[in-house]
Structures are given as C-alpha cells and as structure tokens.
A protein has these predicted regions:
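Two-component/phosphorelay signaling modules centered on CheY-like receiver
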Residues: 11-36
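The C-terminal output helix
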Residues: 117-131
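Short amphipathic alpha-helix used as the core "switch/output" element in two-component signaling
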Residues: 40, 61-75
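C-terminal output helix
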Residues: 87, 107-120
C-alpha cells in the first residue's frame, strides 16, 4: 500500500505542483489549502507524513498551530515545514514544535521527494525497533 502524504499549502499552483510530483513517486497524496480543510481531512485519516506551509491565507502561524494539533494526536508523525519563512527564529520554533525538517522555498521537487523518502525510512526503522 502506498504511503500517504498530506500537503497543506494555500497557493493552489504550488499545492498542485507538489501533489503531482509526489504522487509520481508512488505516494498517495492529499492536498489541502487551509488549516481548517486539513483538520477536516485529518479527522478522517492521518497521513504517514505531513508537509506544512506556515502561512495559510490570513493565518500567519497556521502551520505552527496545525503541527501542534497533529503531534498531539500522533507524536511520531513526521512533519516537514516547507515555507518562505526562513528566519532562524521560525526554524527554531518549527523544530521545537516537533517538526522533523524545516525546508525553505523554493525547493526542487526532486530534493523534496528525497527528503520525504528519507524521513519515511527513518520512521519505519523507528517503528521496527520500538524507538520513540
């Protein structure tokens, strides 16, 4: 069964590009344009990995909020921030919230796909060894 990747990105063109590129790598992709839309989708099923933008529409810290909410549900869920907010304080905040990676935009789709693959392998190894 294909691993499930969720992308939360308010820019429709970027969201479509990421979803297309990731699905071509064999993943099942759910794409959301807002925090509220994503939470509704996550109520139905949590993905295996989440990619979050921080600014979603008018909500300047929506990605941070969403990360908190997701990790409260599933503490071992791999979360990647993919954002234009690249100040060190934002990176520190994202990592302290529990994100596994913090990537700046723009990013090549190949590199993003490799980060996803790498983090899923790490998570799978953690699951097999029982490491929390």
């Amino acid at each position: 069964m294909a691993k499930r990747i969720a992308i939360v990105e308010d820019d429709p063109d970027q969201r479509a590009n990421y979803a297309d590129a990731i699905s071509k790598k064999g993943y099942s992709v759910s794409a959301y344009g807002s925090r509220v839309e994503a939470l509704s989708g996550f109520d139905a099923e949590l993905p295996d990995l989440v990619i979050l933008d921080i600014i979603l529409g008018e909500e300047i810290d929506a990605g941070f909020q969403l990360c908190r909410e997701l990790l409260a549900r599933e503490p071992n869920l791999p979360v990647i921030f993919l954002t234009e907010r690249i100040d060190e304080i934002d990176k520190i905040s994202g990592l302290r919230l529990g994100a596994w990676d913090y990537l700046p935009k723009p990013i090549t789709l190949d590199y993003l796909a490799e980060r996803i693959s790498s983090l899923l392998r790490i998570n799978e190894a953690r699951d097999k060894t029982g490491v929390q």
